[in-house]
Amino acid sequence: MEIRRRPPNPKVQVAHLEYAVPDQDSEPRNILEKIVWEKDREIAVARERMPLEQLRRKVADLPPARDFLGALSAAAVRPAVIAEVKKASPSKGVIREDFDPVAIAKAYASGGASCLSVLTDKAFFQGGFNVLIEVREAVDLPLLCKDFILSPYQLYQARAAGADAALLIAAILTDQDLAYFAKVAAALGLTVLVEVHDAEELQRVLALGGFPLIGINNRDLTSFETDLATTETLTAQFAEQLLEQQILLVSESGLFHRADLDRVQAAGAQAVLVGEALMRQADVEAALQSLIHG
């Protein structure tokens, strides 16, 4: 299903008044579209508060980004683990009440994570760039900014907050967006993790080329249902192309036990992204070690 980037009849603001013409298509058709529409509004507000030029100056003073892809490639364990710092989600609500991102990040680092993923979406995941900044100051592992990126502006936000990599979701971006955003990310020193969920999206990304790190999301973002068979099906269908382009494949979502990791690794995933399974445990370090070593 095509995801509309903004409402067909957006609200218009005149002075202190806001109005819109009601229309049957004015409501989002699924969760992902709802998130995208809200994100579009958030970006507009953020750009007013901090113009791009200010972000450029911040980024210019930063040390080089850490090698996210290199850390996954060189991981001592397989599959390599990207451990996620996540407080909540649209489908599960609050996942961790006692949310201390610094303590969680340090536990992940001690527990054997190769990289970390940090949710920066505030409206639906209760994250934020402030969380990313806190985690960056606490650990030395490469960090992924996990958000719904619709504008190059967000890549600057991610880098300014200390990210070493950024997520690009194929379902909400055109081919032109993917190619352009990848160039902007490269200029900023950011690694790109391109996320796909179905054969059409993976075919698009492989046809574009130049994306050595691809994530297969086992969660359908329109319904938030998960199925590990998604990784198995897509890796089998595109095995030759994935090998030819030397893709490092990440399986994302729905991974709760060592058997789940073994299953997606057998399908061809060299890394996994795990969040909820760890965030629900009192001792996240022990939970991560158990997931890695069984």
UniProtKB/Swiss-Prot annotation:
<protein>
    <recommendedName>
        <fullName>Indole-3-glycerol phosphate synthase</fullName>
        <ecNumber>4.1.1.48</ecNumber>
    </recommendedName>
</protein>
<dbReference type="GO" id="GO:0004425">
    <property type="term" value="F:indole-3-glycerol-phosphate synthase activity"/>
</dbReference>
<dbReference type="InterPro" id="IPR013785">
    <property type="entry name" value="Aldolase_TIM"/>
</dbReference>
<keyword id="KW-0210">Decarboxylase</keyword>
<dbReference type="InterPro" id="IPR011060">
    <property type="entry name" value="RibuloseP-bd_barrel"/>
</dbReference>
<dbReference type="InterPro" id="IPR045186">
    <property type="entry name" value="Indole-3-glycerol_P_synth"/>
</dbReference>
<dbReference type="InterPro" id="IPR001468">
    <property type="entry name" value="Indole-3-GlycerolPSynthase_CS"/>
</dbReference>
<dbReference type="GO" id="GO:0000162">
    <property type="term" value="P:L-tryptophan biosynthetic process"/>
</dbReference>
<dbReference type="Pfam" id="PF00218">
    <property type="entry name" value="IGPS"/>
</dbReference>
<keyword id="KW-0456">Lyase</keyword>
<keyword id="KW-0822">Tryptophan biosynthesis</keyword>
<comment type="similarity">
    <text>Belongs to the TrpC family.</text>
</comment>
<comment type="pathway">
    <text>Amino-acid biosynthesis; L-tryptophan biosynthesis; L-tryptophan from chorismate: step 4/5.</text>
</comment>
<dbReference type="InterPro" id="IPR013798">
    <property type="entry name" value="Indole-3-glycerol_P_synth_dom"/>
</dbReference>
<keyword id="KW-0028">Amino-acid biosynthesis</keyword>
<dbReference type="GO" id="GO:0004640">
    <property type="term" value="F:phosphoribosylanthranilate isomerase activity"/>
</dbReference>
<keyword id="KW-0057">Aromatic amino acid biosynthesis</keyword>
